[in-house]
Amino acid sequence: MASTPSKSSRSSKEAYSEVAIGPYTRLDHIGKGSFATVYRGVQTKSRTFVAIKSVNLGKLNRKLKDNLAMEIDILKYLLHPHIVALLDCLETNSHIHLIMEYCALGDLSQFIKRRDSLKDHSYTRHMISKYPNVSGGALNEVIVRHFLKQLASALRFLRDKNLIHRDIKPQNLLLCPAPKPAPTQSEAEPQIVPLKGSETSFTPAVGLETLPLLKLADFGFARSLPATSLAETLCGSPLYMAPEILRYEKYDAKADLWSVGTVLYEMVVGKPPFRATNHVELLRKIETARDRIKFPEENPASDDIKALVRGLLKFNPVVRMTFADFFENDIITGPIPGLAAEDVPIPDRPPSPEVIPTESAEPQSVSDTIYPRNNDAEPKEDRYPPPHRYVPHNDRPQTPTSSSPMRRTRSGDRPSSAKQIPPAAAPPRPEAVSHATAPGRQELIGRHSSEQQAPGTVPVYKNVDKLKEERELAAQEVAFERDYVVVEKRAVEVNAFADQLAYDPRFHGKQTGALPRRQTTPALPTTQASSQNSPRKAVQVVSGRSRADSAHNRHASYERRYGQSPTSATSAISKALNMASGRLFGVGFSPPLNIAKGGRSPPLAYNPFPAYPTGHAGLLTMGDGARAQASPDEDTRTVKELEECATRSDVVYGFAEVKYKQLIPLAPSSQSYNSPNAPGTNFEEGELTPDAAVTLSEEALVLYVKALSLLAKSMDIAGAWWMRKNRAEALGESSFSRLEPVSIRINKVVQWVRSRFNEVLEKAEFVRLKLLEAQRRLPTDHPSHPNNLSLESAGSGTSVDVMVSPGVTAEKLMYDRALEMSRAAAINELTSEDLPGCEIAYVTAIRMLEAVLETDEVQPSGKGTDKVTLDGVQGEEREVLLKLVSKIRMRLATLRQKLAVLAKRQTPPSSGKMIPSNLAHATPATPATGMATPR
């Protein structure tokens, strides 16, 4: 840890205002996570220290609120010396304040990174003098074994309660000063006394009393998981995730053991065993290693430590070390070798009535000898004077709170649980630089500044390797700066299904290779390495698809192309939207905005489905390339339905991109879709007022959510087809060999859908945050201010309870835009102006109206839809929309006849066979769906 700051630096850090939160006083800020800010605080009466974790309810969606409630419920009953206790829980209108035990030494991550300065810290000076950090490693092995014993004790306690933590990492392992202070510590040094959750909160169950006490924190992802159960939600921190979680597979409590192995490796080596700039690359490195965990040659780790790490870091959870084997390992149960003389346990200590032996599995260690408790002594919090700085209660700003039904009693006010030992009276401890209750990563100050090389002993190539390693580490920390990755169950299902199809050998009989897994990440151009941001973004939901109008020729491949030229981003949809924008957006926008100010719209990153290319490819081709007669069988209908649904989603996506581009005039490739305060998003809005920002954000958000629902339905269609094919093949009724063209095409659409869904999800989350930010900047009397919006107006399709203005719906926006585009196209058609553009506008309007009529669920065949409500579209309204679509199709058919005549006139007479153009290939729409089979 860094040395204690000087008075001058400390005075600058104390420039904060004390805030009363119930019976506690909030002091300085000590850490920040994705959704919470951690403050140091004190109990107002006793002046004992606590950590106050303030969670901003406005940043939480429904899933994260459930996680928070689960965390509170779990922590209420977790009373263990090596688990951070929840002391109290207070709630206000905007925040929930978790009052936690205060851990003055911060987290294990900072402890490892600042290991070279531990010798200068008053809390750790004596420890380092006894157990110095050796060259080529991170922490002394005595300290490593001590921390591992305490972590294992916490995990054993959780397993006894059928709990899985799911986010074990150094940042969630907090450290407290040694329960038995070093004899060299001066009583004149600054003193700090934490408020205890129980009498045994700071009495180690295992390990040494002369070394820091480790506590497991942050149970936001913890859940009850019996030994025979499997979970499927992807959560945790990527660097410490088990590979089965990274692969979107179901997992059990053994996922925690992988995380323990990564933490143990980092304590020994100083860095995680696998590092990468994104979770897909991380999984690739884990798979490539093939269970060969390498340690640096100069690392002095013992063989049994290396064997334990390798047993924990098994790729296959079936062959990974079990909890029983881990808890019975000699490193966990045996004595710690290499102890200093003062820490060696006394073997023949006579028993005393006041000595209570622990139930630990290592009777010969110091951790099993609990010093007698002086029952006549005062509680610790009454033995020490309060801190010097004190503000009278009346002078502090008040924060009205309402205590939750749970308020944890402290010290002797409740019965002790199993394995709880009365603590020994300890002398005062000085204050340390604090970092408590699992705060987020802080900036690293002077990284590697204390590392020195012996002169004349390091070759030049080692310096180059060191520089490369530092760059890789920097890139990794930027990519994983966010604490969490949270993916909803739907996201896991979609990505898992897309991966299953991508790697199925039956789809690649005549292809050069499988599709790359990297498309699992959101398809954000030029920033794919950092696109899987979540979390610390809030929540991610995954699914997706899209396609082009059947009346146009296109490539059969649906793989995305991220060209930077204007032509690569130009499509029929973008042309149609731009045409309508140029003529109608001046009055169609609310509030009116000049689209030219936002630059190109849709932005250059927009790649439509399937981009309306000039090449021609049929729906189904046989092995010799000849066109097959597409029979209206079930598989052909599935392809048609899948592509139509994907195309509708793409039209909605293009409309949302227009709004997004006006809201954020920068290219999406330069954006970070995590937070309104993220780098690259603090743009000067210029003439974009808060009212305009709210309007654009609301419209973009509801359109993105509509696109997500259509993409999800596309994946459901493909999933149902996949289940039918597997069932039929298992029964011997069909074979994939004769359906290879269909299956390959569906596979490509699924991969496109997955990529587009991830991209839309990221942008929707960013727009949501921009909406919340813009709403807060509105005047309090504005109708769109959060205080003036009711729950009834909240967007029902969003991933969180975002309050949008009444009447702002995707269906209304899409209907108005389709009507504007069709009217403008009709006027141009009458004046014979830009007839190809008129066709594009008609097709886009039809697709947009079909998206309005589209339901979110796959409807069974033959189910009536008359006089029913479907996704907010009433039966009568549905009839009106169907009539409008029919009229636009009639105009489209008339226009295509006119275009065919013009194309025939322009054909040279010498040509014996007319070469059809993109428009000439169009066929009349089928009555059932309004779409012909794509050609």
From Swiss-Prot:
PROSITE patterns per record: PROTEIN_KINASE_ATP (PS00107), PROTEIN_KINASE_DOM (PS50011), PROTEIN_KINASE_ST (PS00108)
Record keyword Lipid biosynthesis present: no
Composition bias type Low complexity, residue spans: 397-406, 922-935
Membrane topology per record: Peripheral membrane protein
Protein's name in the database: Serine/threonine-protein kinase atg1
Polar residues: compositionally biased ranges: 518-535
The organism's place on the tree of life at top rank: Eukaryota
Record's catalysed reaction(s): L-seryl-[protein] + ATP = O-phospho-L-seryl-[protein] + ADP + H(+); L-threonyl-[protein] + ATP = O-phospho-L-threonyl-[protein] + ADP + H(+)
Family in the record: Belongs to the protein kinase superfamily. Ser/Thr protein kinase family. APG1/unc-51/ULK1 subfamily.
GO annotations of cellular component type: Atg1/ULK1 kinase complex; autophagosome; autophagosome membrane; cytoplasm; cytosol; phagophore; phagophore assembly site; phagophore assembly site membrane
Gene: atg1
Gene3D superfamilies reported for this sequence: Phosphorylase Kinase, domain 1, Transferase(Phosphotransferase) domain 1
Cytoplasm is among the record's keywords: yes
Chain segments carrying region Disordered: 342-437, 508-569, 905-935
Function: Serine/threonine protein kinase involved in the cytoplasm to vacuole transport (Cvt) and found to be essential in autophagy, where it is required for the formation of autophagosomes. Involved in the clearance of protein aggregates which cannot be efficiently cleared by the proteasome. Required for selective autophagic degradation of the nucleus (nucleophagy) as well as for mitophagy which contributes to regulate mitochondrial quantity and quality by eliminating the mitochondria to a basal level to fulfill cellular energy requirements and preventing excess ROS production.
MF GO annotations: ATP binding; protein serine kinase activity; protein serine/threonine kinase activity
Ranges where the Protein kinase domain occurs: 24-332
Start-end of Basic and acidic residues biased regions: 375-385, 546-562
Biological process annotations from GO: autophagosome assembly; cellular response to nitrogen starvation; cellular response to potassium ion starvation; mitophagy; piecemeal microautophagy of the nucleus; protein localization to phagophore assembly site; protein transport; regulation of autophagy
Active-site residues (renumbered): D167 (proton acceptor)
Subunit-level organization: Homodimer. Forms a ternary complex with ATG13 and ATG17.
Keyword list, A-Z: ATP-binding, Autophagy, Cytoplasm, Kinase, Membrane, Nucleotide-binding, Protein transport, Serine/threonine-protein kinase, Transferase, Transport
Enzyme Commission number: 2.7.11.1
Compartmental location: Cytoplasm; Preautophagosomal structure membrane
Coiled-coil segments: none
